A protein has these predicted regions:
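Extended intrinsically disordered or low-complexity regions, especially N/C-terminal cytosolic tails and loops
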Residues: 1-106, 182-316
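A short mid-domain helix/strand-loop element embedded in enzyme catalytic domains
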Residues: 114-140
Length: 316
């Protein structure tokens, strides 16, 4: 069974967030760009207001102060960028929770030795604080070597996220230190070659005690950086799961999630639902359905999955 390109449910959900988030950020930037064009063309605020009022429920109350619309647009871009960074980390931290829960679920089922004590998210912004991702790599007994080329950028965005969430977007000393870290410049120089991304992250200079002047580009850059780390963590967890653990998780997700996967309910049999999950949703390369079903029988899950599938179809 080739799991080299496979993903678990946690990874799939984060990937879908990343794609959806990128589209959303770009749509917001397009809207502000078109508004900036109107401002540059000298379109009166009243004309813009009348257009928006023509759309039902699109604008409520009066127009914002239009004395200096360029300043308002720049502020909106900053809010999009800052909110985007926080949103990216919210999805990423959820991914970490779900990924480790998947591994813990398999270890509990297989009576394997428990992992070390669970990590806990921290809001600290001290330079010496142990990062949550770093703690997870330690729990997995794994090296961060494969993400060493993105770590400095990750640290920058993690500290920026903390400043936005807990300091109203005011840069801390820790964020400034992350920005001027000697690793940043060489990391950005080799980013495209090492990661395969089309562009390197867009970082902005920060000053302690001043607002972090992010825009939509930093929101996208943060999400792209987190995706690279998520891919590596997903790979490590799949290695620890092995074939048996991966089959167990696919079956648990396909039949025992609440609410159940919509794709499961669309199938006409338990076997088809399981094979669809393995080959399509979780992307097992050159999937051999006979091999997957052998693992399912070896785990003593065939009857349980069949009974659960029948129950789900009755309730659908």
């Amino acid at each position: 069974m080739d799991l080299s390109g496979a993903n678990t449910e946690a990874m799939l959900r984060f990937h879908r967030f990343h794609e959806r988030f990128n589209r959303s950020i770009k749509v917001q930037a397009i809207g502000l760009g078109l508004l900036a064009d109107e401002v540059d063309a000298g379109t009166p605020a009243e004309t813009i207001r009348d257009r928006l009022y023509a759309r039902p429920d699109w604008l409520w109350g009066g127009m914002p102060d239009w004395t200096n619309p360029r300043v308002e647009i720049e502020g909106a871009l900053r809010d999009i960028g800052q909110a985007g960074v926080v949103r990216s980390f919210s999805a990423f931290d959820l991914f970490l929770d779900e990924l480790m829960a998947e591994l813990t679920s398999w270890r509990d089922f297989s009576s394997a030795t428990p992992l070390d004590a669970a990590d806990t998210p921290t809001n600290d912004d001290e330079p010496g604080d142990t990062d949550r991702v770093e703690r997870i790599y330690t729990r997995l007994g794994a090296s961060r070597a494969r993400i060493s080329d993105v770590w400095a950028v990750y640290a920058y965005f993690r500290r920026a996220r903390n400043c936005i969430a807990h300091r109203e977007g005011i840069a801390s000393r820790g964020l400034v230190e992350a920005y001027v870290a000697p690793e940043i410049a060489p990391t950005l120089d080799r980013w495209i070659v090492r990661t395969g991304d089309m562009t390197a992250p867009a970082l902005v200079a920060v000053q302690e005690g001043r607002q972090i002047a992010f825009s939509h580009r930093q929101g996208i850059s943060a999400s792209s950086t987190l995706r690279l780390i998520a891919i590596d963590l997903g790979r490590l967890v799949i290695e620890q799961l092995g074939e048996r653990g991966f089959v167990y998780l696919a079956a648990r997700r396909a039949f025992f999630d609440d609410p159940p996967l919509s794709a499961t309910l669309e199938m006409t049999s338990m076997v088809k639902a399981f094979n669809n999950a393995m080959a399509t949703r979780y992307r097992v390369r050159d999937y051999d359905f006979r091999e997957g079903l052998r693992f399912l029988r070896a785990l003593d899950l065939t009857k349980r999955c069949s009974a659960r599938f029948a129950e789900l179809k009755r309730r659908a």
